[in-house]
């Protein structure tokens, strides 16, 4: 009996030795590029996280998503995964994602306010005009010099949704598709929302896709403002604009982004049989 046990232990030891003796080849998992862009407008370096489709071909043209809050530890990884999934399972074409890493989102995503309490709570705020100029005059031309591009998208949530709304109202020609998630339209006593109808009346009726979403579990002011913003968009009667709205029943401000973008992309790109 003891002899059998010793034989079994010897076999087990030999098997373990073989297993631990095996080697594996290790190499980086690469989904794109990290670039440092020197902005003259913002007087600082900005990190760009760029997702390139599998089999990227520099001779081909691709849509581009400009993703706010696009740091590696923010939204870049999971949004790039959504884009890859929608290319595989839906009718979304292969798409480049440009994640714009934050330096100071309160500074970049808010416009000037004279409200003293906001100035106190957000001392660096109020410079979205410079950030928008950076996007328009520097970043977009740079990306278009590096890649052949087609449609342009912008994704923004919270304060990112505020500046995305500001761009749509003041410089709508900058992008073709606007995904506006939980926009912080409360900023500056809702002044942008109050101007929205007038600003929309001045914009051209060129083809656009606009998606607005908010979580049912968010602050009541966020919900009210998002619903009013959607109403203003619908009443603008832009015949060439597709305007979609989604109340995310199970989400709050912290949980909404991924599921909401999924729902927005479903509205933009219908399901197709897997390739």
What residue spans do the PLM features occupy?
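A domain-start/cap signature at the N-terminus of enzymes
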Residues: 19-63
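Conserved acidic catalytic loop of the alpha/beta-hydrolase fold
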Residues: 50, 133-150
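Active-site machinery of serine-nucleophile hydrolases
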Residues: 74-132
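Alpha/beta-hydrolase fold nucleophile elbow
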Residues: 147-158, 178
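Short glycine-enriched nucleophile-adjacent loop
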Residues: 161-172
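Mobile cap/lid helix-loop segments that gate and shape the active-site cleft of serine hydrolases
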Residues: 170-207
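Short beta-strand/loop motif that positions the catalytic acidic residue
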Residues: 212-214
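C-terminal catalytic histidine-bearing segment of alpha/beta-hydrolase fold enzymes
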Residues: 219-275
């Amino acid at each position: 009996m003891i002899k059998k046990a010793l034989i079994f232990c010897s076999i087990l030891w030999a098997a373990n030795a073989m297993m631990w003796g095996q080697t594996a080849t290790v190499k980086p998992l690469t989904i794109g590029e990290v670039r440092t862009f020197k902005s003259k407008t913002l007087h600082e370096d900005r990190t760009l996280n760029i997702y390139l489709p599998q089999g990227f071909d520099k001779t081909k043209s691709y849509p581009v998503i400009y993703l706010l809050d696009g740091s590696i530890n923010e939204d870049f990884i999971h949004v790039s995964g959504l884009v890859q999934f929608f290319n595989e399972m839906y009718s979304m074409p292969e798409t480049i994602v440009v994640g714009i890493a934050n330096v100071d989102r309160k500074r970049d995503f808010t416009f000037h306010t004279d409200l003293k309490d906001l100035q106190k709570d957000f001392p660096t705020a109020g410079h979205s005009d410079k950030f928008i100029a950076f996007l328009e005059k520097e970043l977009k031309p740079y990306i278009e010099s590096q890649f052949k591009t087609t449609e342009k998208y912008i994704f923004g949530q919270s304060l990112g949704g505020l500046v995305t709304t500001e761009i749509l109202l003041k410089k709508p020609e900058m992008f073709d598709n606007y995904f506006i998630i939980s926009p912080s339209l409360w900023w500056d006593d809702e002044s942008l929302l109050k101007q929205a109808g007038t600003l929309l009346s001045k914009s051209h009726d060129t083809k656009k896709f606009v998606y607005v979403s908010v979580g049912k579990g968010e602050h009541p002011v966020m919900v009210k403002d998002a619903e009013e913003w959607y109403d203003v968009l619908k009443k603008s009667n832009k015949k060439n604009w597709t305007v979609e709205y989604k109340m995310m029943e199970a989400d709050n401000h912290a949980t909404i982004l991924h599921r909401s973008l999924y729902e927005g992309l479903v509205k933009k790109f219908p399901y197709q049989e897997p390739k």
